C-alpha cells in the first residue's frame, strides 16, 4: 500500500530565510535547521520523504509563500551543539502568489 502523504507547515522569518532564497537553492534543496521548539521538533521527526509543507513567512508578511517537499527525513541538526534537535531537508515545489486582504 502506498504511503499516505502528510501535510505540514514550516515557518521562517523572511529576513532569516525567504522564499527567494529557497528558490535559489534549486533542486538540491536546503537543510531546514535551527528549530528550537520541542513541539515543532517533534513534528520534524514525523516528516517523511515525499511529504509536503506550506512555507510560511512569519512576523514579516505573515503569509504562505510556497510549497516545499521533504527530501530527507529528520537527522541531527548540526547547529545544535547538544544534539537534541533535528533538521529536515526540503526543496521548493512551487512559489505561491496569494492575494492578501
Segments predicted by a language model, with ranges:
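A short, structural micro-pattern
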Residues: 4, 62, 82-86
Amino acid at each position: 500500500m502506498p504511503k499516505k502523504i502528510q501535510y505540514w507547515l514550516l515557518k521562517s522569518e523572511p529576513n532569516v530565510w525567504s522564499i527567494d532564497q529557497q528558490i535559489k537553492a534549486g533542486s538540491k534543496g536546503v537543510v531546514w535547521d535551527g528549530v528550537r521548539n520541542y513541539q515543532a521538533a517533534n513534528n520534524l521527526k514525523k516528516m517523511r520523504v515525499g511529504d509536503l509543507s506550506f512555507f510560511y513567512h512569519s512576523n514579516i508578511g505573515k503569509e504562505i509563500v510556497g510549497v516545499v517537499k521533504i527530501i530527507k527525513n529528520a537527522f541531527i541538526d548540526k547547529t545544535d551543539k547538544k544534539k537534541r534537535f533535528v533538521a529536515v531537508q526540503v526543496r521548493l515545489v512551487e512559489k505561491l502568489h496569494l492575494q492578501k486582504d
